[in-house]
A protein has these predicted regions:
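Amphipathic alpha-helical repeat scaffolds of TPR domains
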Residues: 1-73, 97-108, 131-142, 169-170, ...
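TPR/TPR-like (Sel1-like) alpha-helical repeat modules
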Residues: 27-28, 156-161, 180-204
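Alpha-helical adaptor scaffolds
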Residues: 74, 99-116, 121-163
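Alpha-helical positions within canonical tetratricopeptide repeat
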Residues: 81-84, 118, 150-153, 187-190
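Inward-facing hydrophobic residues that define packing positions of alpha-helical scaffold repeats
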Residues: 82, 89, 123, 155, ...
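Structural detector for short beta-strands of small beta-barrel domains
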Residues: 223-261, 285
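Beta-strand/loop nucleic-acid-binding surfaces
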Residues: 265-284
């Protein structure tokens, strides 16, 4: 118990503590007690177990990397440390499937060491759970960096979700660059102006890239749309299909078609039934 108390005390400042990784390695996660793997409760709210917090914090520090030059300007990830840590992360994912975030960080770590072939299978179970979060699709776009069409669809899916605008600035910025590269200048200007409005509202600096784009002829001559929702909807189904590509196909019976709500009720057996929106799949079912 005292050992766990020591870890909790030092864990609180891990984000700004440059020696956190050394401390965690000295402390050794194998010293976590069985109680440390259980959720805690504070003021009526459930809290992530200290074990899950520990693995996430260490993953974040691995992804941050370590200073590689005397001027402390560049960071590099330690691939050897990541490779040593991944089996431990696999164990906690397997032993504690209810932990939501370790699969996400496993995918990030695999990307960091260039192990793309294993990333998708590691990430999909988490992505299916968190599919309504924009950052899931931002990472999915990173996973499919070698497939421009799927990457494009992932950005569309991420931006189609109901999310506070201040969280979407970086995603919109990446997407605007892709749109510009495809000569989709009207759509790119729409994304850029959305970013500008958000940054102005928050009192944030526009940044060099936005400022440079605003001075270029393509931006000045482009037409701004009210939004890019039609573009998003045109491509989201391609992104959504990724989530289920590794699952076996099943045959079901259609019970009812609600043309007003554009939903289909289906049933396979007395234990498996449900409904889904068909507008992205079918025009006239």
């Amino acid at each position: 118990e005292a050992y766990s108390f020591i870890y909790k005390a030092f864990h609180k400042g891990y984000q700004t503590w440059s020696r956190y990784m050394s401390f965690a390695e000295w402390w050794n996660f194998e010293n976590l007690r069985s109680e440390d793997y259980l959720e805690e409760e504070f003021n009526g709210k459930k809290l992530m177990s200290i074990a899950e917090q520990a693995y996430i914090a260490y993953s974040k520090k691995l992804l941050e990397g370590e200073m590689s030059d005397p001027f402390r300007q560049q960071r590099v990830v330690d691939k050897e440390k990541i490779e040593l840590f991944l089996p431990k992360l696999d164990t906690i994912i397997e032993d504690h499937p209810k932990y939501q975030y370790p699969p996400y960080f496993k995918a990030k770590l695999l990307l960091a060491i260039g192990s793309e072939e294993n990333v998708l299978s590691a990430f999909l179970p988490f992505a299916r759970q968190k599919a309504n979060n924009f950052w899931v699709w931002e990472l999915m776009a990173e996973i499919f960096s070698e497939d421009p069409e799927i990457q494009f669809a992932c950005y569309c899916k991420g931006l189609s979700l109901n999310t506070p605008e201040e969280y979407l600035v970086n995603l919109r910025l990446k997407f605007a660059g892709i749109l510009r590269g495809r000569s989709m200048y009207n759509e790119a200007k729409t994304e850029i102006n959305n970013i500008i409005a958000t940054k102005n509202n928050k009192g944030w600096d526009l940044g060099i890239k936005i400022s440079n784009w605003m001075e270029q002829d393509w931006y000045k001559n482009a037409e701004e749309y009210s939004n890019n929702q039609d573009l998003y909807l045109e491509h989201t189904i391609k992104a959504e299909n990724i989530l289920y590509n590794d699952l076996p196909e099943e045959i079901v019976a259609v019970e009812f078609v609600d043309r007003n709500r554009k939903t289909i009720n289906f049933v396979e057996n007395q234990h498996k039934y449900g409904k889904f929106k068909y507008s992205n799949f079918l025009k006239n079912p």
